[in-house]
Structure formats: C-alpha cells, structure tokens
Amino acid sequence: MTGKTVTRADLAESVFRKVGLSRTESAELVETVIDEICNAIVRGETVKLSSFATFQVRDKNERIGRNPKTGEEVPISPRRVMTFKASNVLKTRILKAHVTRKVKLKPQNPTP
C-alpha cells in the first residue's frame, strides 16, 4: 500500500491533465459528479458505476449487541447504512496490482 490518499483536488487535476478542461472546469466537473452520486444515495437510489462499484443504502434492523469490556447486552438502534461493493473488474485489477507488487518486492537469490 502506498499510503497516499486521493483527494477531490487530485481528481480535478487528473481531469485537467487528461481531458483538457480548465482547472476550474475540472474542479466543477468533479464536484458535480460527486454531488450527483451523493444526491442519488440520499434519495435511497442504488448507484452502479459499471466496472467500478455499486453504492447502496441498506436498512439495518434493531438488534442486541454486547459491550466487549463488560459483556453487557445493549440495544443497537435501527439505522441506514451505505454499502460499497467493488465490481469484479475492480477486484481483478486490485489483485493483479498486488501480485505484480509482490513479485517486484520478492528478493532475488544470487546465482553462484
């Protein structure tokens, strides 16, 4: 893992370099796409981005949990959660990148 976090500004810069829009237009484009995704999720719609992932809101029922320190049972309120499910295409890309990185890091045995 590289430890780098990709920000909105990074995405806008990438759009600027690859698409040729101005920096301002690139930032506006990134903001618009993120806003549209967020608005759809808030409305309870599923957002499916082919070859990337699916974002979905799910309702969780009330349930009984347990305090790990005391063992005491505590009720957990019903709530809505957002899930992110990576597509098989993305999962494959991640696996290939991991395998490639492992091969590069593997120490070479010197030949006698």
UniProtKB/Swiss-Prot annotation:
GO BP: any one term: regulation of DNA-templated transcription
PROSITE patterns in the record: HISTONE_LIKE (PS00045)
InterPro entries cross-referenced by the UniProt entry: Hist_DNA-bd, Histone-like_DNA-bd_CS, IHF-like_DNA-bd_dom_sf, IHF_alpha
GO MF, one example: DNA binding
Entry GO CC: cytosol
CDD domains reported for this sequence: IHF_A (cd13835)
UniProt keyword terms in alphabetical order: DNA recombination, DNA-binding, Transcription, Transcription regulation, Translation regulation
Database matches in SMART domains: BHL
Subunit structure, interactors included: Heterodimer of an alpha and a beta chain.
Protein family (similarity comment): Belongs to the bacterial histone-like protein family.
HAMAP family: IHF_alpha (MF_00380)
Role this protein plays: This protein is one of the two subunits of integration host factor, a specific DNA-binding protein that functions in genetic recombination as well as in transcriptional and translational control.
Protein name: Integration host factor subunit alpha
Organism: Rhizobium etli (strain ATCC 51251 / DSM 11541 / JCM 21823 / NBRC 15573 / CFN 42)
Recorded name of the encoding gene: ihfA
